[in-house]
Amino acid sequence: MPPQKYHCNVCAQDITRSIHIRCVECVDFDLCIPCFTSGASLGTHHPSHPYRIIETNSYPIFDENWGADEELLLIDACETLGLGNWADIADYVGNARTKEECRDHYLKTYIESDCYPLASVELPGPVDRIAFAARKRARIEAFQPPPIIPQKPLASTPQCHEIQGYMPGRLEFDQEYMNEAELPIKDMNFDDDLHESAKHEMQLKLTMLNIYNSRLTRRAVRKQTIFNHNLLDYRRLQANEKRMSKEERNLLNKTKAFARLLTGPDYQKFVNSYHEQITLKKQISDLQEWRQMGLTTLEQGHKYERDKTQKFLLSKASASYDKQLRHVKSFNQTTSAPFQVRDIQKIVPRKPATPTMFSASADRQLLSEDEQALCSKLQIFPKPFLALKFALISASLTSKKPFQKTDAVNLFKHLDANKVEQVYDFFHNARWIGAPT
């Protein structure tokens, strides 16, 4: 319920919060200052009537930050709207007052007063009216929301017509939803014939129009969804999806059906919350697995995950190597000359890996920091390095004598001996292969 407003009876200007004139003889007759000084009259009112000057009473009396007019509005609102309804009371008082401010001021000034049930009228000192007005103005300006900057309208460019099929000036698409909805009614007309047979025909036509209106409603809903979620900016959406991981893209595709039910910000909040829920479930599952394995710290858990991933990749590389070996053996049985791996290298030379290519490799996180530094130095990709690691460790474990550096070089004759020696030294220093010390 808004507070009572006062308007000039001559020009109808709002004079609620400004100084105005009230006629003593006429009932509820108020004048603004310009109409009063010009001697305006209306009805039974005459400029010679006695008058009173009505001020806004914005000077503080109980609190240095609350004016007398706000005190009157607060008491009036509490009496009219009821104590405890502080949200409506704050709207009634206005002047950018919040419900917390109204509640705290009422309790402090009237309930906790030393003169209860009266309010204490003793101010700590004189109040500067100019400073009080400046604080009030700053509070009102800070309460007002910032102006909404209108978005730049889409230009009717060839991109809109050829790629998106959208015409911004008409807010239409080349192919609308249910594009043939207008065909059943395009030749419909209404006659003035009111015979009994014409009434049934009229009812049929009205039913067809209702069906057409329902289709227009569904079309408008889908179009509004496109505008609310800014789906016309497909390049930005594609760029955002490319930066997502595979799991995030799958999650986004699953939740796109809910976009029609939510606004743009609410839908984005829903997607983020859903993704956070899945992430937390995955973390809980990992923690439960770590606890079952006897791990008690996060560092042990991360090391366990790295080792598990490396074990999986090594087993996968071993299976692939066995498959290729069987293929080579079957190929040698059908040819006169044996086929070896170095023959492939002669036919299709490999381009050496660069540090930039290695840093962009998808399997780089499967290696430790020392292994990454070694691969970057020797220009070896992670997957070949893991296969080489598996082969060297397996050969060292199955060797009946201490596995020496020459054994590693002889095992990989088709590879660069210098690289094999450096990899052997790295594994030997890590105590993974070689003679025990």
Swiss-Prot record:
A zinc finger (ZZ-type) spans 3-59. It comes from the Eukaryota. Disruption phenotype: Cells are sensitive to replication stress hydroxyurea (HU) and also exhibits weak sensitivity to ultraviolet (UV) and methylmethane sulfonate (MMS). One of its GO terms (biological process) is DNA recombination. Zn(2+) 2 binds at C23, C26, H45, H49. Pfam families: Myb_DNA-binding, SWIRM, TADA2A-like_3rd, ZZ_ADA2. It is found in: Nucleus. The keyword Membrane does not apply. Component of the transcription coactivator SAGA complex. SAGA acts as a general cofactor required for essentially all RNA polymerase II transcription. At the promoters, SAGA is required for transcription pre-initiation complex (PIC) recruitment. It influences RNA polymerase II transcriptional activity through different activities such as TBP interaction (via core/TAF module) and promoter selectivity, interaction with transcription activators (via Tra1/SPT module), and chromatin modification through histone acetylation (via HAT module) and deubiquitination (via DUB module). PANTHER family: TRANSCRIPTIONAL ADAPTER 2-ALPHA (PTHR12374:SF20), TRANSCRIPTIONAL ADAPTOR 2 ADA2 -RELATED (PTHR12374). This is SAGA complex subunit Ada2.
